[in-house]
């Protein structure tokens, strides 16, 4: 089976049984189809099993991968689907040309306004609410409001009272001088309802129902009860679509197994038009990692600052405000908090998928190590040991080793190391120390030697390890280096005297195994480093300076990167990032003692 088919098969197994939308992509990573589903896993599986009509068969033949977005209801899925189709215009979807395809409810701009359902938006002619997922939904909402509020119904003002007046669904402004303030109050209540605020209208109906019941008018009371139930069924709060047109980005995140996934929903004109997903290994606390991420997210000119940024309430608003120059909102309740929660839920789903896919791929690892050995020109590496270092500015440096046997993690043979002989952040010397300690003990205790050693790094790391093995310990074990790209993803395998790139296909089983090994050793090292920091406390020269607490220390390290850079900074540099003048003076003096 071709690799992309196997990847799709693996991913199908970890898709949740929840409502949502999915995006099918071709070999060029272009979205070719957008769909929705009540249960994502069932719908997605249906594409890759059984017979299909000619159009679907052509579609499936072009699919190379898929993505999905979890929503909270089927209605949300439908609304999101409409937006995604408009955004990507996939060729296998029936394209919707413009906003005229969507039904809206309109309150006309007249002395005595009317309620209309329309697909045409004309600015300056009234207030528009929507879009609604279909005409039926919009018409049902209008009918409900017509029954509750005696709003004008006629296109043109007639010269006599019509049927609507006689059945209590119009105040008759065509004949009577209707109090404009009463009409304005109705308009306000209707507007609130169409904006998603249904408490006022429900309270009013409950009061009417109670009054009718006390008057023994049970038929009227039943009518009000039915209206209340109808509203509760109709007003399934929409998180994906909002009548609030504020331009905003919504952030949510999830953390697991040393990794953090951050999801960003881009909300424009009340619609979620795009999603960004980022996976990063945790090197700090989750809060500190988020502050660094969001600062870079907008500072790298990849994303335009919106009017509002919505973030979880556990984060420090002032810290985010120091790096993001726009309004920061931490919703406590309602649809806005629901949206933040939905972003976090999608982040959790993405993390779970990552780990589930890794776990399911273990059964195919023998093929991976055979392929790896062939491409490197060595014997099949049954036992692989991989090393990675972890520290922050040289503080509490540690290293970790993971062992893979037959391409599977052998966790009982994982090892942790605290760096003992190296002062400061020196990755090369730290790696030499750990390798020396590890294989001196292996030789002394007669433990099994690995068939391949992998270091997280490049030629410098490899040469240091080879020197220790050959010239100090008399061992001849293949040593390879794994490098990452700027997105912190496994990029290439280096091997040989000149650290040449091993020609592995990025979609091969061997490359995927290397990616997993690098992720695992990094996770293990980061987790150990975090545990070490929690025990000893992150100690630095900044801890002894009055006025510098944990927040300001994080701000300084993020702004300058190192103590060395802080020593080169001027008093004005400190003040420019928000450090008070008296604290800045004290900091400047202490750094130059």
Curated annotation (Swiss-Prot):
UVR domain mapped to chain residues: 199-234
GO molecular function term, any single one: DNA binding
GO terms for biological process, alphabetical: nucleotide-excision repair; SOS response
The keyword DNA repair is assigned to this record: yes
Protein's UniProt keywords contain Electron transport: no
Cellular component aspect of the GO annotation: cytoplasm; excinuclease repair complex
UniProt xrefs under InterPro entries: GIY-YIG_endonuc (IPR000305), GIY-YIG_endonuc_sf (IPR035901), GIY-YIG_UvrC_Cho (IPR047296), RuvA_2-like (IPR010994), UVR_dom (IPR001943), UVR_dom_sf (IPR036876), UvrABC_protein_C (IPR050066), UvrC (IPR004791)
Record-linked Pfam families: GIY-YIG, UVR, UvrC_RNaseH, UvrC_RNaseH_dom
Main location: cytoplasm
Compartments, as annotated in UniProt: Cytoplasm
Keywords on record: Cytoplasm, DNA damage, DNA excision, DNA repair, Excision nuclease, SOS response
SUPFAM superfamilies: C-terminal UvrC-binding domain of UvrB, GIY-YIG endonuclease, RuvA domain 2-like
Domain GIY-YIG: 17-94
Origin: domain of life: Bacteria
Subunit text: Interacts with UvrB in an incision complex.
Similarity comment text for this entry: Belongs to the UvrC family.
Function (record text): The UvrABC repair system catalyzes the recognition and processing of DNA lesions. UvrC both incises the 5' and 3' sides of the lesion. The N-terminal half is responsible for the 3' incision and the C-terminal half is responsible for the 5' incision.
Protein name: UvrABC system protein C
UniProt organism field: Staphylococcus aureus (strain bovine RF122 / ET3-1)
